[in-house]
Amino acid sequence: MKKQIETTRLRIIPCDKKILEAILIGNEALSQLLSIEVPDGWTDNDHSPFEYAYEMIKAHHSEVGWWAYLPILKNENLLVGSGGFKGKPDAAGVVEIGYEIFEPRRNTGLATELARALVDHAFENKKVKKILAHTRAHHNASCRVLEKCGMLFTEQIYDAEDGELWCWEVPFNKRETIQSLIHNF
């Protein structure tokens, strides 16, 4: 799972150790390494998710592609957020996705394009049987993004760090049925 993902508007780059090191150093280092424009505030996160991904990839190089990805807007060569997985599939074949889009580029369909690409990419791996995601426990733009990716709301949970969350999932064997319903709606 190391390949770059291409969509209509995005080039989605898997973060290896070198890219994660550049993220941790700063925007200029990342810009120089990838020859892209890196705007201030491109991520809503502090560096902890990238630090964690770095440590995991450092310990398990084969997991490149199961952590962070960087979506680059092709026509501007601009970093517009981040996304990826929270590790390789577990024993049951479950992976979790996460994504974010740079605030000035939200509400343009980029989050949906990124999330769909991640879902499609994960399901290319025969070990993946189900994909999960979590949102805040209220209707928001992320809920609609996940619905457009074929995900269904499953339950509300409480997380000690994040509070109330809604859980979403799409099992591989239901994906085509859900997608056809969405596209015909």
Where are the language model's segments positioned?
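GNAT-family acyltransferases
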Residues: M1-E96, I101-P104, A117-H121, N125, ...
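Conserved GNAT acetyl-CoA-binding A-motif
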Residues: N125-H134
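Glycine-rich acyl-CoA binding loop
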Residues: N107-T112
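Short alpha-helical segment within the catalytic ATP-binding CA
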Residues: E100, E113, A141
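Conserved beta-strand-loop-alpha-helix junction that forms the acyl-donor binding cleft
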Residues: A133-C143
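Conserved active-site tyrosine of GNAT-family acetyltransferases
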Residues: L146
